[in-house]
Amino acid sequence: MQFNIQEIIKMIPHSYPFLLIDRVTACTPNESVTAIKNVTFNEPFFIGHFPGNPIMPGVLIVEAMAQACIICTMSSMQNYSVYLMSIELAKFRKPVIPGDTLILTVNVVHKRKNTCKFECHAHVEGTLVAEAQILAMTKQNEA
């Protein structure tokens, strides 16, 4: 499965400037997702991080990974929400700068009842720039 931005907006409860997924190029529901974030000079976070030396904040790379995890889960569910429970083993290996295309891959490595553990990686031009493990839970929305 692939998703364009209009389909992504229906799955993720975020909006500009906090929606950090532009496109999903591959999705196997509840198993894996490959998503793209086009990093442009116009990103609002570059104003202060850092003037004259713009670098995408690591916390926003992890947020993009978490949003890819939401898509992995929500692509097969309706009337549910996904909540972040923990981030572990986050590592930032190279800076992400304007003009980069961030390729995010998330894979479910453990699932139990309403929780999923994801192994997440971010690459730019084939080079690993960040990685983390994310634990998330699903909860049915109240009517």
From Swiss-Prot:
Listed transmembrane segments: none
Q: Which InterPro entries match?
A: FabA_FabZ, FabZ, HotDog_dom_sf
The organism sits in which domain of life? Bacteria
Q: Write out the entry's keywords from A to Z.
A: Cytoplasm, Lipid A biosynthesis, Lipid biosynthesis, Lipid metabolism, Lyase
GO MF terms, alphabetically ordered:
(3R)-hydroxyacyl-[acyl-carrier-protein] dehydratase activity
> Which processes are annotated in GO (biological process)?
fatty acid biosynthetic process; lipid A biosynthetic process
Q: Which GO terms describe its cellular component?
A: cytoplasm; membrane
EC numbers: 4.2.1.59
Q: Which reaction does it catalyse?
A: a (3R)-hydroxyacyl-[ACP] = a (2E)-enoyl-[ACP] + H2O
The enzyme class is: lyase
Pfam families in the record:
FabA
Where in or outside the cell is it found? Cytoplasm
Active-site residue numbers: 49
Disulphide-bonded residues: none
Function text: Involved in unsaturated fatty acids biosynthesis. Catalyzes the dehydration of short chain beta-hydroxyacyl-ACPs and long chain saturated and unsaturated beta-hydroxyacyl-ACPs.
The record's annotation in HAMAP family points to:
FabZ
Of which family is this protein a member? Belongs to the thioester dehydratase family. FabZ subfamily.
What protein name does the entry list?
Answer: 3-hydroxyacyl-[acyl-carrier-protein] dehydratase FabZ
